[in-house]
């Protein structure tokens, strides 16, 4: 089977940038024009053909890297590590960047050898170190490395130089008699005028924190790589005004050299550090990582005796976190009295830290605040093994109106406004109100009784202390930061850590547990495991040898579809820096496996063009060759097109955003990394986007793989990475067939419609036209199905209907039987059933619901939302179990799979987090912001999923006969809940039991109805699934396009009706082209597409059949 489709892609030839086939791109070959033959050396072939162009850049990089690697090896007898390999490629591509990496991977070594490399090539280098001693050490190492490189002149300056040495330095420095200049951060500050006049090919800053202490140093560094002061001042001025720095002339901005800086330990402050982003395309990064290998243990008995027992069990390498200095002193005294050697952050900490570092102290004791000395300030991967918390770190907030913080005021007032529409219209944007004005408004409109109820309602997952008028919220970020000291990346290994929490309060512990699970997906274990865990922690540190950095690490680029998804992933991976590549933002993260660069393609990059062949498909010797061009979008009118045009074909604007720029940026990054992983959506469209990117990147990086993320969580990410694969070419071919069929039939039918109706907004397609026919047929059936009914309401509130116009004042009820019935749960949602339920419940258009689902998926709240499956995996079942355990309802668990193993699951929550908890997490800024409607849709999904994994509730049903002289009707009514089950999530309506007696009719209403209901958006999608027309990914789009073309409208009851235009269009199409828009033909075509997906049918033979069909349409013209 061919590993390519034979399609032709514009801009994809690695040499000329012209059209190339995906077949040749897969092989890493330029197009046939550049290289007519496939055999032999590519570079030689291009030279012989006199066609060498862009390929030379790629070839040069590979050659230069081989030379650099040999040079590197010659200096330290080791090849570059994965980190150093990645940095070297960036260096060779003349890029400026931040070195973001853990301790022990050779950042300084890389800087020194890079300096020698540049110097050997005739360039000038400045190396900047934070202290004089480090300058001397670096100079010494450089001299050692350069013994065989006699032509490299190394000049360094320290304050300890003797007078003659200083005079010699000054002469050589002023005259530029050096290849490598080694200086301190202080030298940068003092010699600004001189350094600003010099231009270096490379400036390497070993400790950027020291340089950033003075903002003037930033100007100096930028001057040193050839950026003019005018460009710096203009960029700074634009930053202050919020303007675009791209307006500055390119020649003024363009650096002549490269700037490489080490990562910062603290976030750079002020506006000046933003110059690096604006002028060099990178932000000063900090080494942060989400990589954690921590086991959490809760100990409920909170006594000093128990604490001492645990400390003696752990022995050494302990951080003890306490809530206050006062309590800390009491604990420290007790431990010292019992022989524990410890230091305290509030008492000669620097001395204690050094003693702890060298091993003469077992334990350091400090206060657990987010910026505490022990929480953030230390990094000793081999020394710190255990974190012990004396109580849960938490925030306490007053609930008294006069003292309540803003978030409580805002949350409660927002809720109050929901039930007061007029007031809500007045208070449109609470964000604009000052806190005091907000407080006064709350006091004015909300009574103390209502306020207390709102507190209880809106903060259900916090600990509420009614006596002290406080709510207590766990400080989960401090807990994560502090416990994270125990598990660090050192070199290329991740140490094991143990976090032990002493907490008596069950409710507070559960609150922390839920938040920790949401953010880190970590679980808790029992106290009995501690001894085993201690051994594990020791073993991971013993395994870390001094040459652990020799283990090869990979640099990888991961490409997702949307920036939102990229942002979500970067949060749980914890991005260390952000870099701009053209129009792409790239987040850089450090994981245990190496460096990850995360970016987004922003959807499809290629689509069929229209001009070549038959609507973008060339027919050559019986084969169909699609031509794909980059998607262009007009910035003025928003129109999309693919043809190579200098102006928008719709509004004539020359402001065109071409996705070719994204492709070029992705190829550029691919040259830097070891591997590329494509993580587009797990469906046919995602596969095609992945394929388009893959074939474009393959010429510069053959290591391209595909992953499917069915949930955007750390668990989903790790699982996907473990199951990497190649792109599925059958899925790609299936999408090609769908797109060509849509283009051929859709274009031809649309052109005929537009010509006949003189309306360029009209369109047609198999599925949309078939569905339009259903709506029209349903209207006809509906109009013929009128009947009269009377609705009665009895004096016990029960309602029922009877056919005909009937006028009675009382009825008699006879109880036929009473019986128990177990009510089975509904299956979890798939796309059609969820669209139906959400549309009915919230009265939203299905397209809007799909957008809400897309957001919930991309932000990591639900599984993939385009699915026909109702299957629940073992992971999903564990989520249900975990939540029921948390709320004390585990006896109601009844795990169900609901379907066979397949590519997708049902739509379900990805974590055991209730809608109420999620609302709390949003308020606490733990979770990304969601609108109230997003929460409602999530609640619908959560409740249906939980119900699907629970026991069936048992009800007592009464079968009753309601009769009168003119009618009798039978009804079955639940009158008692015998056993609870899934009803705790989806309540069951239970009626008051009937008695055998006469009931009065308290109201009656006679009206005309129809036995055949019109379609709603929800029922139409149900029908599409039932009749196998369309797919989960297209249901909502089909309905949406019928609205956009003004073929259908919704009446006041949200029912679908055809417009006069819709009826005329369908009449025209059905009279002339019924064979192409009838249901059976459309269904058979869906089956053909599926057979291409599975590899049963060759996509070329299917295209041939479609082409023959199209010819019939063309003949009918």
From Swiss-Prot:
Top-level taxon of origin: Bacteria
EC number from the UniProt entry: 5.6.2.-
S-S bridge residues: none
Chain intervals for the UniProt region annotation (Topoisomerase I): 551-1117
Subcellular location: Cytoplasm
Residues at which ATP binds: 84, 101-108
Zinc finger (RG N-terminal-type): 3-42
Cofactor: Zn(2+); Mg(2+)
InterPro entries: DEAD/DEAH_box_helicase_dom (IPR011545), Helicase_ATP-bd (IPR014001), P-loop_NTPase (IPR027417), Reverse_gyrase (IPR005736), Topo_IA_2 (IPR003601), Topo_IA_cen (IPR013497), Topo_IA_cen_sub1 (IPR013824), Topo_IA_cen_sub3 (IPR013826)
Residues reported to bind Mg(2+): 561, 681
One of the GO BP terms on file: DNA topological change
Comment on activity versus temperature: Optimum temperature is 75 degrees Celsius for positive supercoiling. Optimum temperature is 60 degrees Celsius for ATPase. No supercoiling is seen below 50 degrees Celsius.
Main location, first listed in the record: cytoplasm
Helicase ATP-binding domain boundaries: 88-284
Domain Topo IA-type catalytic residue range list: 728-1114
Recorded catalytic activity of this chain's protein: ATP + H2O = ADP + phosphate + H(+)
Record GO cellular component, one term: cytoplasm
GO MF annotation list: ATP binding; ATP hydrolysis activity; DNA binding; DNA topoisomerase type II (double strand cut, ATP-hydrolyzing) activity; reverse gyrase activity; zinc ion binding
Binding site for Zn(2+) 2: 634, 637, 648, 651
Motif range (DEAD box): 206-209
Subunit-level organization: Monomer.
Miscellaneous section: This enzyme is the only unique feature of hyperthermophilic bacteria/archaea known and seems to be essential for adaptation to life at high temperatures. It may play a role in stabilization of DNA at high temperatures.
Domains: entry comment: Introduction of positive supercoils requires the cooperation of both domains. The helicase-like domain probably does not directly unwind DNA, but more likely acts by driving ATP-dependent conformational changes within the whole enzyme. A beta hairpin in the 'latch' region of the N-terminal domain plays a regulatory role in the enzyme, repressing topoisomerase activity in the absence of ATP and preventing the enzyme from acting as an ATP-independent relaxing enzyme; it also helps to coordinate nucleotide hydrolysis by the ATPase domain with the supercoiling activity of the topoisomerase domain.
Family designation: In the N-terminal section; belongs to the DEAD box helicase family. DDVD subfamily.
Annotated function: Modifies the topological state of DNA by introducing positive supercoils in an ATP-dependent process, increasing the linking number in steps of +1; also positively supercoils with dATP and ATP-gamma-S. With UTP or dTTP relaxes negatively supercoiled DNA, in the absence of any nucleotide partially relaxes negative supercoils. In the absence of nucleotide has a higher affinity for dsDNA with a single-stranded tail than dsDNA or ssDNA. Has an ATPase activity in the absence of DNA.
Name used for this protein in its record: Reverse gyrase
Source organism of the structure: Caldanaerobacter subterraneus subsp. tengcongensis (strain DSM 15242 / JCM 11007 / NBRC 100824 / MB4) (Thermoanaerobacter tengcongensis)
Name of the gene: rgy
């Amino acid at each position: 089977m061919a590993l390519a489709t034979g399609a032709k892609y514009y801009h994809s030839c690695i040499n000329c940038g012209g059209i190339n086939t995906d077949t040749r791109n897969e092989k890493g070959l330029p197009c046939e024009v550049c290289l007519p033959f496939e055999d032999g050396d590519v570079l030689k072939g291009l030279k012989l053909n006199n066609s060498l162009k862009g390929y030379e850049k790629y070839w040069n990089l590979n050659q230069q890297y081989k030379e650099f690697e040999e040079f590197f090896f010659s200096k330290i007898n080791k090849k570059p590590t994965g980190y150093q390999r990645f940095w070297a490629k960036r260096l060779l591509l003349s890029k400026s960047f931040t070195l973001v990496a853990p301790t022990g991977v050779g950042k300084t070594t890389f800087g020194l050898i890079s300096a020698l490399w540049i110097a050997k090539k005739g360039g000038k280098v400045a190396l900047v170190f934070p202290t004089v001693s480090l300058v001397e050490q670096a100079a010494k190492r450089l001299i050692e490395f350069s013994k065989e490189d006699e032509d490299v002149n190394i000049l360094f300056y320290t304050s300890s130089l003797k007078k003659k040495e200083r005079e010699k330095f000054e002469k050589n420095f002023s005259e530029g008699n050096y290849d490598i200049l080694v200086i301190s951060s202080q030298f940068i500050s003092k010699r600004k005028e001189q350094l600003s006049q010099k231009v270096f090919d490379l400036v390497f800053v070993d400790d950027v924190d020291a340089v950033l202490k003075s903002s003037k140093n930033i100007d100096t560094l930028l001057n040193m790589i050839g950026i003019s002061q005018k460009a710096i001042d203009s960029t700074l001025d634009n930053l202050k005004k919020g303007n675009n720095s791209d307006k500055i002339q390119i020649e003024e901005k363009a650096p002549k050299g490269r700037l490489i800086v080490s990562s910062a330990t603290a976030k750079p402050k002020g506006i000046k550090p933003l110059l690096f982003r604006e002028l060099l395309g990178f932000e000063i990064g900090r080494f942060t990582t989400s990589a954690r290998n921590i086991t959490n243990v809760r100990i409920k008995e909170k006594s000093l005796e128990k604490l001492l027992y645990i400390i003696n069990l752990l022995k050494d390498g302990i951080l003890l976190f306490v809530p206050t200095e006062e309590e800390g002193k009491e604990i420290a005294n007790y431990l010292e009295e019992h022989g524990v050697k410890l230091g305290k952050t509030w008492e000669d900490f620097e001395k204690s830290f050094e003693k702890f570092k060298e091993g003469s102290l077992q334990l350091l004791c400090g206060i657990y605040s987010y910026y505490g000395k022990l929480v953030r300030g230390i990094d000793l991967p081999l020394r710190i093994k255990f974190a012990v918390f004396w109580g849960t770190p938490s925030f306490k907030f007053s609930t008294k109106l006069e003292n309540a913080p803003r978030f409580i005021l805002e949350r409660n007032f927002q809720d109050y406004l929901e039930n007061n529409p007029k007031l809500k219209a007045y208070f449109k944007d609470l964000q604009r109100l000052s806190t005091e004005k907000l407080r006064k408004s709350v006091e004015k409109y909300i009574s103390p009784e209502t306020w207390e109820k709102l507190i209880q309602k809106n903060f259900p997952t916090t600990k509420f202390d009614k006596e002290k008028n406080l709510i207590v919220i766990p400080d989960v970020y401090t807990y994560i930061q502090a416990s994270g000291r125990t598990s660090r990346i050192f070199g290329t290994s991740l140490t094991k850590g143990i976090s032990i929490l002493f907490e008596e309060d069950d409710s507070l512990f559960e609150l922390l547990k839920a938040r920790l699970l949401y953010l880190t997906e970590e679980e808790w274990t029992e106290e009995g495991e501690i001894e085993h865990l201690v051994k594990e922690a020791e073993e991971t540190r013993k395994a870390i040898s001094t040459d652990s950095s020799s283990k090869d690490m990979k640099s990888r680029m991961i490409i997702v579809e949307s920036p939102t998804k990229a942002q979500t992933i970067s949060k749980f991976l914890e991005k260390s820096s952000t870099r701009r590549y053209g129009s792409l933002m790239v987040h850089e993260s450090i994981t245990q496996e190496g460096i990850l660069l995360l970016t987004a393609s922003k959807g499809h990059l290629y689509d069929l063009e229209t001009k070549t062949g038959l609507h973008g498909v060339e027919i050559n010797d019986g084969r169909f060759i699609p031509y794909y061009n980059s998607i262009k979008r007009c910035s003025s009118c928003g129109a999309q097109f693919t043809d190579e045009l200098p102006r928008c074909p719709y509004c004539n604007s020359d402001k065109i955003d071409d996705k070719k720029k994204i492709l070029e940026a992705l190829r550029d990054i691919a040259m830097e990394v070891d591997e590329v992983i494509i993580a587009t959506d797990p469906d046919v469209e995602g596969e095609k986007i992945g394929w388009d990117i893959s074939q474009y990147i393959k010429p510069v990086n053959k290591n391209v793989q595909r992953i499917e993320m069915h949930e955007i969580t750390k668990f989903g990410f790790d699982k996907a990475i473990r199951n990497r694969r190649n792109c599925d070419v059958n899925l790609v071919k299936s999408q090609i067939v769908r797109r060509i069929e849509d283009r051929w039939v859709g274009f031809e039918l649309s052109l005929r419609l537009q010509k006949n109706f003189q309306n360029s907004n009209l369109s047609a397609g198999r599925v949309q036209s078939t569905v339009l026919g259903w709506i029209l047929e349903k209207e006809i059936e509906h109009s013929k199905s009128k009947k009269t009914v009377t609705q009665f309401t009895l004096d016990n509130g029960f309602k029922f209907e009877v056919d005909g116009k009937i006028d009675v004042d009382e009825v008699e009820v006879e109880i036929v039987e009473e019986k128990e019935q177990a009510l089975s749960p509904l299956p979890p949602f798939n796309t059609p059933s969820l669209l139906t339920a959400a549309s009915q419940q919230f009265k939203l258009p299905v397209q809007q619901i799909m957008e809400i689902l897309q957001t919930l998926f991309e932000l990591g709240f639900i599984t993939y939302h385009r699915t026909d499956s109702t299957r629940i995996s073992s992971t999903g079942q564990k989520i249900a179990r975990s939540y029921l355990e948390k709320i004390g309802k585990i006896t109601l668990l009844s795990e169900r799979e609901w379907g066979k193993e397949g590519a997708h699951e049902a739509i379900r929550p990805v974590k055991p987090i209730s809608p109420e908890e999620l609302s709390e997490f949003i308020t606490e800024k733990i979770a990304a912001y969601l609108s109230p409607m997003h929460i409602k849709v999530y609640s619908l999904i959560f409740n249906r999923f939980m119900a699907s994994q629970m026991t069936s509730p048992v009800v007592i049903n009464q079968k009753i006969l309601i009769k009168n002289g003119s009618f009798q009707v039978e009804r079955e009514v639940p009158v008692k809940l015998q056993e609870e089950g899934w009803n705790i999530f989806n309540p069951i309506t239970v009626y008051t039991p009937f008695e055998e007696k006469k009931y009065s009719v308290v109201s009656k209403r006679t009206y005309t109805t129809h036995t055949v209901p019109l379609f709603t958006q929800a029922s139409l999608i149900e029908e599409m699934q039932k009749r196998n027309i369309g797919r989960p990914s297209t249901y909502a789009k089909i309905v949406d396009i019928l609205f956009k073309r003004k073929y259908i409208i919704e009446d006041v009851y949200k029912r679908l009706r055809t417009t006069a235009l819709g009826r005329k269009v369908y009449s025209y199409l059905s009279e002339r082209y019924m064979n192409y828009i009838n249901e059976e033909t459309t269904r058979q075509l869906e089956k053909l597409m599926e057979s291409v997906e599975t590899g049963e049918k060759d996509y070329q033979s299917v295209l041939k059949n479609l082409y023959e069909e199209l010819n019939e349409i063309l003949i009918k013209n």
